[in-house]
């Protein structure tokens, strides 16, 4: 690719150092100076090899002078021809691959060739090149010479005068009669690295995915802090903009147009289309706009500030009308601590920033072309909505949990027993990955994997240390308390839920009461304690009796059929039933001797017996499901409950009185 860029003729160029008078032919190459040739533009081709030029430290570099001859510098198409040869003599195959060329016009030549004939030791700061080689060819000639100017060469040169940031010729001579220019460099090029060395393996990207997420979160948090501080100046800026809208609008538009035109002529670098090559456009470097410059430029806009709120995905088009966003703020949601929600909201905010940058670039293009400030909001909205399916993006393209082929196990409670399957089938279902860390496993090493009874998957020896634990599914389905080998992840999960009451036998394993007699006995005691505890809470003299309930977890006496793994193991060992019986005995003794508790009992209305009965007497008492009254089991008839009959008669009486009054 060949690109041209012009420089102002009056641009200051400092003299180059090391000027001497010398002319001649180097390495037997013919002299390229032709005084009869008509003046034409100078062609300077910048060529860079795709490999990095590295100078070994142990190799003694031999200096070799490079000659070039030019006529007197002028403004009418002066030609600049340089002869250069690499000391190490790189092969043509190394210099011929993937080269980028840049043609400098006569103005550029005039600026470069205006060196002082007397010489100077100052460094040139107005002309810098970063390509590996500079090939300068005079139009009409087939000879091409190379000048190594790679920053890598400059950086590894053992000589202190070499600068790694700028291209600085060692010697430059402008003869009065011939205008010869001599350039000398000391370089040794070695193409010792292949391009594959600089390519990261896929495994590294997979393993470091959490680093990318951490960087995104840290970047978002730091941006939030900055935005909170910038919000304090929002009010003053808005007042300033509103005051200048009426008076300075024409000046603002003129300033905006001028800055955009200056930006178009700035020094930029673009991709040349060839591997490892870049095209440099040599032009005056324009000053980068600061935050306050952008604010002054955008005085003519109506919407000055852009507010990006987490969770407010539908209001993104309201901010698209702003051409240059000057302030962004992020607000918090109540459930901001959720990791999945945080990732989704971060993705939304980054997409909003992306769409705003697209709008700004479209606005700048429209201003430079037609001078209008018109943004097609509807088009931007459609494009944004079509490319912003957050759920699909996170699920398929940017999965946080592992990769598309593997995902780490989830923190979940499994209530089913895994059927026995062949090892090869299970590992094949895992895509030959370790279920814990995602390490690929070759088929010949499948036998070394270890099976986890809780998850029903195979793990490597790093993720499975032969830890043993009870399986909840086997306890609830088969009343099996044997310990089985589980993975490290499963062991940690089961230990974390060991004391948590999350197993409701009424909904999970109701048939378990018939299989386990000790569990059925605990169920009966638990029902009595459930009712008597309610009665004791209403008595102001039952403090000593209520303290007895502190010996067991609260869920055993507050709710029915609710157990933890620890409770089930204690029931199996026979440790929980005696403790519950002692608590029940102390509670019954208090109720029998307390007048307040006796006054809250029931009298059986069927037999009219004066003995007080209570709901916790499950052996002799039965409660009506409708009115919750207590009766003797042998006396109770659900179809003829006296209390329910009285309630029905009272309701009918009230309805009849209300109808008669109307």
Curated annotation (Swiss-Prot):
GO terms for cellular component: autophagosome membrane; cytoplasmic vesicle; intracellular membrane-bounded organelle. This is Protein associated with UVRAG as autophagy enhancer. It comes from the Eukaryota. Residues 1-34, 58-131 are annotated as: Disordered. GO terms for biological process: autophagosome maturation; autophagosome-endosome fusion; autophagosome-lysosome fusion; lipid metabolic process; regulation of glycogen metabolic process; regulation of lipid metabolic process. It comes from Homo sapiens. It is a peripheral membrane protein. Changing residue 633 to R: Abolished acetylation by KAT5/TIP60 and abolished ability to promote autophagosome maturation. The modification N6-acetyllysine is found at residues 483, 523, 533, 573, 633. Expressed weakly in cervical carcinoma cell lines. Phosphorylated by MTOR at Ser-157 under nutrient-rich conditions. Phosphorylation prevents acetylation by KAT5/TIP60 and impairs RUBCNL/PACER function and autophagosome maturation. Under autophagy induction, Phosphorylation by MTOR is repressed, enabling acetylation by KAT5/TIP60. Acetylated by KAT5/TIP60 under autophagy induction, promoting autophagosome maturation and lipid metabolism. Acetylation is prevented by phosphorylation by MTOR. Lys-483 and Lys-573 constitute the key sites for tuning function in autophagy. It is found in: Cytoplasmic vesicle, Autophagosome membrane. Residues 100-113 have a biased composition (Polar residues). Keywords: Acetylation, Autophagy, Cytoplasmic vesicle, Lipid metabolism, Lipid-binding, Membrane, Phosphoprotein. Changing residue 157 to D: Phosphomimetic mutant; impaired interaction with STX17 and abolished ability to promote autophagosome maturation. Its main location: membrane. Regulator of autophagy that promotes autophagosome maturation by facilitating the biogenesis of phosphatidylinositol 3-phosphate (PtdIns(3)P) in late steps of autophagy. Acts by antagonizing RUBCN, thereby stimulating phosphatidylinositol 3-kinase activity of the PI3K/PI3KC3 complex. Following anchorage to the autophagosomal SNARE STX17, promotes the recruitment of PI3K/PI3KC3 and HOPS complexes to the autophagosome to regulate the fusion specificity of autophagosomes with late endosomes/lysosomes. The keyword Oxidoreductase does not apply.
């Amino acid at each position: 690719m060949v690109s041209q860029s012009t420089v102002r003729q009056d641009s200051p160029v400092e003299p180059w150092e090391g000027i001497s008078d010398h002319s001649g032919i180097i390495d037997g190459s013919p002299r390229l100076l032709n005084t009869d040739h008509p003046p034409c533009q100078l062609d300077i081709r910048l060529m860079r090899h795709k490999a990095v030029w590295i100078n070994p430290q142990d190799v003694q570099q031999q200096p070799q002078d490079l000659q070039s001859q030019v006529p007197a510098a002028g403004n009418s198409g002066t030609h600049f021809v340089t002869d250069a040869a690499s000391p190490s003599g790189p092969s043509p195959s190394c210099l011929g691959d993937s080269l980028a060329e840049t043609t400098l016009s006569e103005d550029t030549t005039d600026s470069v060739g205006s060196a002082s004939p007397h010489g100077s030791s100052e460094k040139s700061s107005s002309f810098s090149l970063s390509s590996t080689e500079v090939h300068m060819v005079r139009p009409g000639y087939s000879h091409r010479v190379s000048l190594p100017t790679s920053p890598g060469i400059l950086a590894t040169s053992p000589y202190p005068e070499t600068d790694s940031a700028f291209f600085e010729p060692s010697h430059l001579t402008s003869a009065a009669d011939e205008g010869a220019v001599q350039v000398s460099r000391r370089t040794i090029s070695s193409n010792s690295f292949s391009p594959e060395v600089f390519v990261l393996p896929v495994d590294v990207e997979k393993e470091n995915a959490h680093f990318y997420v951490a960087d995104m979160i840290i970047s978002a948090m730091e941006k939030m802090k900055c935005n909170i501080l910038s919000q304090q100046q929002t009010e003053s800026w808005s007042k300033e903009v509103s005051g200048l809208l009426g008076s300075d609008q024409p000046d603002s538009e003129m300033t905006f147009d001028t800055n955009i035109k200056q930006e178009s002529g700035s020094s930029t670098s673009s991709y040349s289309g060839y591997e490892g090559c870049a095209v440099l456009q040599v032009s005056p470097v324009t000053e980068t706009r600061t935050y306050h410059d952008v604010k002054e430029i955008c005085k003519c806009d109506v919407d000055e500030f852009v507010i990006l709120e987490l969770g407010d995905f539908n209001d993104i088009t309201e901010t698209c009308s702003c051409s240059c966003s000057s302030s962004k703020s992020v607000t918090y949601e109540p459930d901001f601590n959720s990791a999945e929600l945080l990732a989704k909201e971060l993705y939304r905010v980054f997409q909003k920033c992306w769409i705003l940058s697209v709008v700004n670039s479209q606005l700048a293009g429209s201003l430079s072309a037609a001078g209008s400030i018109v943004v097609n909001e509807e088009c931007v909205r459609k494009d944004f909505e079509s490319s912003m399916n957050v759920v699909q993006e996170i699920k398929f393209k940017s999965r946080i949990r592992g990769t598309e082929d593997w995902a780490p196990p989830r923190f979940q409670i499994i209530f089913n027993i895994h059927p026995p399957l062949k090892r090869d089938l299970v590992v094949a279902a895992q895509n030959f990955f370790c279920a814990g860390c995602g390490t690929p496993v070759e088929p010949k090493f499948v036998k070394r994997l270890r099976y986890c009874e809780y998850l029903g998957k195979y793990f490597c020896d790093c993720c499975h240390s032969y830890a043993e634990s009870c399986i909840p599914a086997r306890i609830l389905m088969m009343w099996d308390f044997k310990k089985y080998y589980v993975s490290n992840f499963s062991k940690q999960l089961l230990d974390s839920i060991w004391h948590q009451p999350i197993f409701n036998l009424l909904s999970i394993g109701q048939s378990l009461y018939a299989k386990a007699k000790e569990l059925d006995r605990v169920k009966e005691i638990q029902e009595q304690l459930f009712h008597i505890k309610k009665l004791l809470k209403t008595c102001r003299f039952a403090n000593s009796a209520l303290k007895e309930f502190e010996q067991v977890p609260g869920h055993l006496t507050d709710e029915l059929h609710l157990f933890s793994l620890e409770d089930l193991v204690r029931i199996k060992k026979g440790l929980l039933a005696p403790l519950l019986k002692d608590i029940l005995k102390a509670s019954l003794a208090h109720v029998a001797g307390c007048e307040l508790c006796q006054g809250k009992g029931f009298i059986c209305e069927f037999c009219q017996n004066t003995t007080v009965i209570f709901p916790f007497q499950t052996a002799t008492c039965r409660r009506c499901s409708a009115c919750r009254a207590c009766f003797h089991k042998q006396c109770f008839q659900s179809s003829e409950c006296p209390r329910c009959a009285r309630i029905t008669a009272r309701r009918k009486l009230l309805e009849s009185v209300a109808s008669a009054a109307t």
